[in-house]
Amino acid sequence: MNLFVETLGQGPDVVMLHGWGLHGGVFARVAEQLATRFCVHLVDLPGHGASPALPRFDADAVADLLAAHFPLPAQVVGWSLGGLIAQHWAARHPDKVKSLALVATSPRFVRDETWPHAQARASIEAVAQSLDGAFEQTLERFLALQMMGAPSARDTLKALRGELFSHGRPQGLLPALGLLLEADARALAGRIQCPAALFYGARDAITPIGAGRWLAESLPDAVLYEFPQASHAPFLSHEQDFVRALAEHLETQA
C-alpha cells in the first residue's frame, strides 16, 4: 500500500502522524519550523487525506505499514489517533523508533469504570452514525469539539477548517473511528522503551490531561508538558510554546 507522505527539510528523520478526520497537512506550520534542523515526514494515515483506505483500520497493521515505509530509525510525533498508532509502532518495532512525542492522545479513547480519562462511548458513536448523511458537517462539528475551551478557539478552528479537505475527500474515516471505539493500548506502556515527551492541554475534553498523566507514570522514560489554556490541539493554539518544547525534545534525542 502506498501512503501519501510530504517531506520537508534535511537532518534526522521525524515522522508526524495526524489525528482522526484530518491529514498530515495539519502539521504544516510546525513542520516548516522543524525543517531547518530535521527531515520531517508528514504522513496521511490510511483512509485519510490522499492515502487509500484499508478494509479494516487495525493499529498493529498500520504500525507495521509505517515501519516498512520508514525503515531507518526515526523520531515519531503522534497526535490523538496518530499518537495511538505511534504507541503501537514503538512497542512493535523498538529498533525503528528513537523517541516518541505524544500529543493529546491516549491508550484508550472510551470512558469506562477502569478508564475515566476519555469521552463517553456514545459521543464517538454519534460521530460514526452521522458520517454517512452529513459528512462535511460532522467533521466540522468534530473540529469544533476539539477546540472547545481554548482561548483562541475561533482562529484555531478557522485554520483547521482550511486544511480539512486540502488533500481531497478522505475515503476511510469510519474504520478508523471503529478503532477509537475499541482500542485499549494500556498494556503496551511497559513495552515502550524509548524516551517520550507528552504534550497535553488542560482543557481537552477528548483526551483529558489525566490520560497524559497516566502515560507519564506508566512509560519508563517520559516527560509531561502541560498547556493550562490549551484544548485538543496545543500545536495550533499554542504553536510557539509547542514548537519550542518539541524541538528541544527532538534535538535531545536525535
From Swiss-Prot:
GO cellular component: cytoplasm
Residues annotated as binding substrate: 20, 80-81, 142-146, 232
Reaction(s) the record says it catalyses: 6-carboxyhexanoyl-[ACP] methyl ester + H2O = 6-carboxyhexanoyl-[ACP] + methanol + H(+)
Superkingdom assignment: Bacteria
Pathway(s) this gene product operates in, as recorded in its UniProt entry: Cofactor biosynthesis; biotin biosynthesis
Broad enzyme group: hydrolase
Active site: 80 (nucleophile), 204, 232
GO molecular function per UniProt: pimelyl-[acyl-carrier protein] methyl ester esterase activity
Subcellular location(s) of the protein: Cytoplasm
AB hydrolase-1 domain segment(s): 14-238
Enzyme Commission (EC) number: 3.1.1.85
Biological processes per GO annotation: biotin biosynthetic process
Record key words, sorted: Biotin biosynthesis, Cytoplasm, Hydrolase, Serine esterase
Similarity annotation: Belongs to the AB hydrolase superfamily. Carboxylesterase BioH family.
PANTHER family found in the cross-reference section: HYDROLASE ALPHA/BETA FOLD FAMILY, PIMELOYL-[ACYL-CARRIER PROTEIN] METHYL ESTER ESTERASE
Task performed by this protein: The physiological role of BioH is to remove the methyl group introduced by BioC when the pimeloyl moiety is complete. It allows to synthesize pimeloyl-ACP via the fatty acid synthetic pathway through the hydrolysis of the ester bonds of pimeloyl-ACP esters.
Oligomer status and interactors: Monomer.
Record's protein name: Pimeloyl-[acyl-carrier protein] methyl ester esterase
